[in-house]
Amino acid sequence: MRADLCPLASLLPPDAADEPETAYYRQRLDDPSLLDRAFAVQVEGSAFLAVPVGGCRKGGYLSVSEVVTGLAARSLLRGRPGFPDVRLSWSPYPDCCHVVRWGARVPYEDDPIAEGRFYGYSEEALASFAKTYGHLT
């Protein structure tokens, strides 16, 4: 979808995202070079990173508060390399975010370490998480 036809969301270069968010991914991803192919998606007044799949990263997501904004973001990411099967998961609850997802389906095993591996986080980042929050690896 052309950006000028989608006023509710726009794609920007990855450096348009906030530095703390970029640093978050840079510190945790097993393959930080994925950030070179990421997009900053500007929605609802802020720019959030959409990190593509690749290597051990099997999927990604972007939370949005409005369905129409999620539909716009989905349209912008669809068909781009590293963003397969872009879809919108609607929240049934009015006080929760809707989620634009891409890649494989998240394995809901109630296991934050498995989920971290799914999102391509490094073993070092997962070990740090486990130590901090007491989860087993």
Q: Across the structure, where does each feature detected by a protein language model lie?
A:
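Activity-critical C-terminal alpha-helical subdomain
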Residues: 119-120
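A conserved ligand/cofactor-binding region detector
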Residues: 1-106, 114, 123-137
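Conserved short secondary-structure elements within globular domains
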Residues: 111
